Amino acid sequence: MIHNPILQTSLDFLHLMATIAWIGGMFFNFLVVMPTVAKVLDPATAGRFVGALMKRVRVVVYVSLLILFVTGIPMKIANENYVAIISFENAWQIAGFIKHVFVGLMAVLAFYSFEILTPSVVKLSAQGPSPAITTLRKRQMMIAAATTFLFGIIVIFLSAVMKYL
């Protein structure tokens, strides 16, 4: 246990803020930004806009991941249910392992989206409409749907479950 309530509260606060920034940003991007961009902007402008937006979002996501990592380790170790880094001795450890698998998958998909997919979309969008850009945008939406709604909700749900185990 962390016996210093100020430290414990600070770690929890930073952890929650990073979670809100990352997963909340994904929800907003998927539900508001991407549909609006697709409806309002021509492909070339949409590509430039998404490229510029993702440069900023990427920083938020990577900083959030760093904060989650730095705050999550002491919070996990200090929890009374903690046994080992990887342990399946109690329900809390199992839920935590599953949650972190999904967080890892979300991080990998975010990296793929920011470093591989978005630059390709920006490059192709500059050339105008094409079947390739349509395919990449569908892949972008599929990743956003999977990470935002499925994985993000699973992570938040498992976090809530872990509070009561």
Give the location of each predicted region.
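Polytopic transmembrane helical bundles with strong interfacial aromatic enrichment
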Residues: M1-L165
